[in-house]
Structure formats: structure tokens, C-alpha cells
Amino acid sequence: MSQALRRKSGEKSWECLQNRKFNIITRESENRLLHYLEFTHFVRQPVSCFLCNTYPQCIRRFRSLHREKTGRKRYMLRELLDNVREKAPLIQNITNYVAANDCANITLACGASPIMSDCKEEAEDMSRICWGLNINMGTLNPRKAETMVLAGRCYNEKNKPVILDPVGVGASGYRKALAAELMKNIKFQAIKGNISEIRSLITGGTGSRGVDADQGEAVTEENLKSYIEMAQDFAKETGAVILITGAIDIAADSSRAFAVRGGHETMSRITGCGCMLGSLLAAFEGANPEKSLEAAAAAAAAMSLCGERACRRMVKEQAGNASCRTWLIDEMYKLSGEELEKGADYELYEKGHVVICRH
């Protein structure tokens, strides 16, 4: 963009600021405003004035008026993690034996407490004492399937959140049939899966990659809006928040959606990363049952941020994916609500438009 065009665009941003017309704030609009202020206010002043308080005061006013206009809280995700650490919800995980230990540890790391019970005879008692249930379809057998259905009903009776992680649902007819039975008999607060798993739930089709997402279906900037629409339609159909995981995570209910960026490609080389996110999601939903969509976005953002940090350390120390797995749990243990708020990279969409952008 030429300087003249940038100046004109910034002038429009300043006019909107003065008239309090902003309903969207993005990094781009802020940069345009900064550029305009440089030309109009400071270009005619001594260079030293560029370092005075007037400049940041203008930006503080810009942000303050935006918050006043939209009425949105500055801290959206911070309080959700803080609630998990303060309330320490007890979460039952009916999960797979491949990732059970990691799921338990990351639940502890975020501040919640896990119970890894898949005993049908305990379902009623567990639903009384636990705050939420995570159902993971990773390793199945008929006994575990019966427990899933019974436990889900028990939690529904007590109005406690139930999470579905349909691992590899498109890999076999048995998995598809069980997923259909679960969705018929249980009201889920959130459903989490990669794009192939979510599409299989919607269409009833099969996938060729087992528990892994088909790379041809990956969420990208080009298809992001269409996948948001798909997630919102599925959310409307099921009444659940839909969390689609990938390079860009999508958390959606019937009217709003978060696009959460971050993470690292090495996370796909760690068995159980998706299962850990499912346990994390159950903990966030259990501690924040009235903010289901925000809880899903916060869980995804926390996992992405901790994954980035763990992978950076792996590269720095020339380590491997097993070390990265341990550091991922360590980073979750160390993560504060303030760090999550500052480090989260996301946009919030309403009616197809970005209303909050945090990068």
C-alpha cells in the first residue's frame, strides 16, 4: 500500500475513533491509525515529541473507546484457566490405554483432578462426585462401549458436561455405529475431533487415515470460513460446541466461532496430543459450564501455546519428540491465566465477521 493510501486509510480510522464508530479492532486497523498519527500529529513536531506521552495516550484512547463501544472484557480467556485452577474440578476420563497416563497428567497440570475409570458398575457413583465426563473412543471393546453409554446418561441426568472425542470414528463400521449410538443417547456439551473425524460424524463416511486427519481436508486460511459454517451447522444440529483441531483450531456454537492459531507441526509426532486436549477440554468445561464455547477456545489456545513452547525448547536443546511430550505437560503446569491471555492467538467470528482479533 502506498503512503498516500495508507494515510487516507489511517485518516478514516481516526475519524471512526473520534465518532466512536469502531465495532471491530484488528492489528491492521491499529497499524493504520498509528501510521496516520505519525503523519498528522508528529511529522510537524520535533523528533523528540515522537517519544513523548501523547503518542501512547492516543493509542490507549483508541483501545479504551473500542472497549467502551463493544462492551467486551479485555480478559476473555484468562478467567477460564483461573477458574480451573481455583475450582480444581474432578473429571472422569473413559479414555484409551495408549494415552491414559498423559491425559491424567495434563489434567493435573492444568489444575483439575482426573479419575480414569471405565468400570460400568461405578458409573452412577462417579457421576455424583465428578464435575464432567470425557468419552474417548481411541481403544474400544464392548465392555467399554457399554460403560460410555451408561456413564453419559448418568451425567446427563445430573446436568453435568459430557465431552465426546470420536477418535478414528471413520476407520471402522463398529466405531461409526458406536458414535451414532452415543450421539443418540447422550447430550454432549462439546464434541472434539480433527477435521476427518468431524466430517465422518456429519456424513457417516469412512476415512483412510485411521485416527489421523486427511491432509487434503486440512483447515487453511482459504477454507476457514467454510469450515466454520460447517462446524456451526453441526453445532446447531447437535446442541454441542464443536472443536475441530488442526493447524487452525475451530471452536464453534450455532452463532459464534473462534479460530485459534498456534501449536507446532511436531505435536503431530506425539501420540496422544489430541487425547490430551480432550481431557483438557473436559476440565475447562467442568469448571466453566456456563461458558462452553469460550472454554473450548481456551483449552485449544492453552494446548497450542504450551505446544509451541515445548517444541521451541526441543529445537533449542536438540532433543526429540519424547522430551517434547514431557515438556508439553510441564508448560501446561507452569501456564498462568495472564500468560494464556497474552499468548493466545485467535479471532472471534459472529455472523461471519471478525469481532475480536488477538495476535
Annotate each predicted stretch with a short phrase.
Residues 110-157:
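Active-site cofactor/substrate anionic-group-binding motifs, chiefly glycine-
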Residues 305-359:
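Charged C-terminal helix
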Residues 264-281, 292:
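Short glycine/threonine-rich catalytic loop with a Thr-x-Gly-x-Asp
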Residues 41, 59, 70-116:
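Glycine-rich phosphate/adenosyl-contacting loop at the front of the ribokinase-like
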